């Protein structure tokens, strides 16, 4: 079987969704800038050999509608001979894009793909136009469609206290801030134009959503936002609302080697899994278990792990049941996570994979895992190997 490899991976800075640096920048532009950048950064790749552009996006309406993958690729100047498709596995959409490209490569259905995803949550709100079928209530509780309440449920089932959540959130901001000021995000962020608070055009090369001033004391003062009477999940322990995109150049390994390209990582294994929608945040556990089994590996073999931080109350049960509690500080989300950086839905799978690959290079690690939960009860996971 042919092997799928990552030749390059980049992301935009993460902009704050409410009045942030990308308030005047459309989702197609965020996407197109990265597509163009991948081709500029890799002149050895003939754009005419691109088989498909596979782009994740959840809210496929307004500026994100009518196949944003094609709209953005045309905007970017990707050759018209390349296909383009927008995929939606909710939070796992851009990791799904990676999986689709990898499967195509493994089965000989193309050797060069641009994949990634975007979500401009400031322009297209997460719940815009959502209309669940009334009959769904026969099988799934209404609260299962409310992500914050599913985090509350999962946290309660696993004994995750408010204090544990606050500590996890502070860690996310502290680590993301340290990574930012120490330049550890520099290799993954592709600077693009945005606007400052006064409306002046600026080149944005930093994540706007990190809050370095976050402390246990400041978080302790926040009220539960999803279950005000009995809950523990606050805005401070939930992923930030942000706007952003991430992209990867995925190729067949022998083709990349023949072109003399640097291979940054190989896709070792992939998996998706379902779980009860009421505890949707638990999805990374079965997805990771499947991906590891397919690779013939164990969680102990993973040198670096990126777990998307939808909520602290969701992340901690996954850390616990994956057997990672004792190695969190050494292996898990070493540059912070979505609590600090935000979770632009369609972007996040490619974003955490990009961060993971850069961390693997920084630590000279061999194996890494990127995994995330998905609304309504799914998980997705990818094992990467440096070669």
Curated annotation (Swiss-Prot):
Highest taxon listed in the record's lineage: Bacteria
Pathway: Lipid metabolism; fatty acid beta-oxidation
Keyword RNA-binding: no
PROSITE patterns: THIOLASE_1, THIOLASE_2, THIOLASE_3
Enzymatic reactions: an acyl-CoA + acetyl-CoA = a 3-oxoacyl-CoA + CoA
GO biological process: fatty acid beta-oxidation; phenylacetate catabolic process
Listed GO MF terms: acetyl-CoA C-acyltransferase activity
Keyword Cytoplasm found: yes
E.C. number: 2.3.1.16
Lineage: Bacteria, Pseudomonadati, Pseudomonadota, Gammaproteobacteria, Alteromonadales
Catalytic residues (UniProt): 91 (acyl-thioester intermediate), 343 (proton acceptor), 373 (proton acceptor)
Keywords, in A-Z order: Acyltransferase, Cytoplasm, Fatty acid metabolism, Lipid degradation, Lipid metabolism, Transferase
Primary localization class, coarse: cytoplasm
UniProt enzyme class: transferase
Full protein name: 3-ketoacyl-CoA thiolase
Locations listed in the record: Cytoplasm
Oligomeric form and interacting partners: Heterotetramer of two alpha chains (FadB) and two beta chains (FadA).
Any one annotated GO CC term: cytoplasm
Family: Belongs to the thiolase-like superfamily. Thiolase family.
Purpose: Catalyzes the final step of fatty acid oxidation in which acetyl-CoA is released and the CoA ester of a fatty acid two carbons shorter is formed.
């Amino acid at each position: 079987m042919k092997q799928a490899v990552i030749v390059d991976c980049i992301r935009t800075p993460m902009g704050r969704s409410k009045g942030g640096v990308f308030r005047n920048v459309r989702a197609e532009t965020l996407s197109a800038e990265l597509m163009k950048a991948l081709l500029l950064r890799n002149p050895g790749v003939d754009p005419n050999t691109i088989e498909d552009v596979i782009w994740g996006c959840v809210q496929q309406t307004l500026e994100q509608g009518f196949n944003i993958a094609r709209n953005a690729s045309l905007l970017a100047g990707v050759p018209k001979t390349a296909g383009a498709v927008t995929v939606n596995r909710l939070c796992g959409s851009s990791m799904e894009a990676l999986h689709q490209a990898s499967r195509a490569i493994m089965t000989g259905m193309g050797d060069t793909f641009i994949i990634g995803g975007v979500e401009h949550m400031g322009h297209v709100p997460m719940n815009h136009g959502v209309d669940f079928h009334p009959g769904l209530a026969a099988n799934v509780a209404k609260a299962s469609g409310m992500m914050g309440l599913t985090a509350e449920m999962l946290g309660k089932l696993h004994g995750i206290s408010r204090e544990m959540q606050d500590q996890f959130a502070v860690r996310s901001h502290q680590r993301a801030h340290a990574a930012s000021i120490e330049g550890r995000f520099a290799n993954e962020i592709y600077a693009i134009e945005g606007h400052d608070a006064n409306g002046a055009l600026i080149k944005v090369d930093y994540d706007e959503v990190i809050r370095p001033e976050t402390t246990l004391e400041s978080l302790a003062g926040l009220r539960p936002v999803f279950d005000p009477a009995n809950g523990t999940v606050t805005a401070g322990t939930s992923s930030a609302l942000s706007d952003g995109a991430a992209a990867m150049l995925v190729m067949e390994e022998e083709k990349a080697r023949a072109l003399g390209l640097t291979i940054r990582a190989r896709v070792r294994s992939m998996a998706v899994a379902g779980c009860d929608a009421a505890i949707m945040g638990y999805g990374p556990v079965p997805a990771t278990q499947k991906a590891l089994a397919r690779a013939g590996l164990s969680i102990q073999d993973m040198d670096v792990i990126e777990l998307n931080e939808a909520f602290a109350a969701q992340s901690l049960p996954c850390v616990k049941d994956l057997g990672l509690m004792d190695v969190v500080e050494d292996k898990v989300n070493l540059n912070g996570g979505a609590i600090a950086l935000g979770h632009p839905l369609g972007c996040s799978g490619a974003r955490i994979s990009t961060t993971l690959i850069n961390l693997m290079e920084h630590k000279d690690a061999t194996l890494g895992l990127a995994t995330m939960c998905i609304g309504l009860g799914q998980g997705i996971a990818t094992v990467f190997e440096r070669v």
